[in-house]
């Protein structure tokens, strides 16, 4: 076999050689010594050729993340905080996700991300829907954990903890902040029961109740946001929910690997 050895500073040529798995050796000039780069890739080579740091390389590079609303972004932040504490590999990439501050319905987001003519645009972004929808990795869509709308997940979870007299209600942080069972009864459960009666009255009189439950849940969440934040932290750390929390992490990782190259972010940042 004929072997060819040559040197180059051409980024495009190096990128092509790496893509076809050619043997690329990159030597790093460290002033007083020269050593071979371990596992060279185009991102590390570009950084060294341009005398940049990792922070310089990724300063303006982010992956757009679209969610349905502010409530979803709030819970997504809590999930990210959990993943940073639990998975060291996630710590270096969490800041690369840019949560777009816009409210778009699940139906509209799904329509955008499944539109074949927009694929070139949407494949550069990640869509995160509430848990009452399904993930669609092919179209860059992932569903939040919980298998229901976030507010519904938390309301059901609060009721479950209340009925079970869970130790959550005796946790020092919860008690010190005043979020006792009495708080739950007065500010949340009574409101839920009252709204349920109101919905029944509307249905019996022939009035439409479409969307009313969702609107009520969102208002209740925002009126008691700090309580629900603590509740969701407990939900995330509950072993009963580990499969859902881990499923979301895995699917988010898969989408990161698909989307990162479009933003000149090395997939190796999240191995």
Short names for language-model regions:
Residues 23-24, 51-60, 111-114, 142-154, ...:
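Short secondary-structure transition/capping segments
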Residues 123, 129-213:
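Activity-critical C-terminal alpha-helical subdomain
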